[in-house]
Amino acid sequence: AVVAHREPLLAAHAALVVPTVPEANAADAQHAVEKAGKAFAGWNHTPVAERAATLRRAADAMQQQLPRLCALLVKEAHKGWSDAVSEVREAIDFLRYYANDAERVMAPQTLPGPTGESNTLRLEGRGAWVCISPWNFPLAIFTGQVAAALVTGNTVLAKPAEQTPAIALEAVKLLHAAGVPAD
């Protein structure tokens, strides 16, 4: 949900102004919960291979944007450059890991029936998930939480740390561009 009210944010370590991000109030949050609930069935019925491919596209996009994302981590979270590079790489690894693991774990399994019937075990998403991430790994942990929930068929309401929301917003933009529905 896009919120009109925006204020500049100060980085946790010093008075560096970082990009503005939308702020949400209780009504915005309630609206987002309702939208995530409505979107769940459609996303859950998206084949796991397609959801995994979406995460891989996001990983590729994140790799292409690595310098820009590192610069934002340096500015917003006061990471050193090498730590920022490591964090972006870890976020990329999370996207690829969960994509690969979901295809393996969520593949339908044929189970033998005691009387010869055909049984298939299918894992399904559970609904709308809330992911709350910390400020100290604002891209890697945020991305890992969101990726795991999305690839298993769940919709996500993500609440980044208030000290580092701009990098999380960039991750969300990359996920949407890769094919995760915005609504």
Predicted regions and their residues:
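Generic recognition of stable, solvent-exposed alpha-helical segments in well-folded globular domains
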Residues: 31, 49-57, 64, 68, ...
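Hydrophobic, well-ordered secondary-structure elements that form the walls
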Residues: 51, 95, 149
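Hydrophobic alpha-helical scaffolding
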Residues: 1, 19-22, 26, 48, ...
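Amphipathic alpha-helical
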Residues: 81-106
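Glycine-rich, acidic and aromatic/proline-enriched surface loops and short helix-turn segments
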Residues: 64, 97-101, 135
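Short, structured beta/alpha segment
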Residues: 1-75
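Alpha-helical scaffold segments in carbohydrate-active enzymes
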Residues: 57, 61, 90-98, 174
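Rossmann-like NAD(P) dinucleotide-binding subdomain of oxidoreductase/dehydrogenase enzymes
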Residues: 74, 102-183
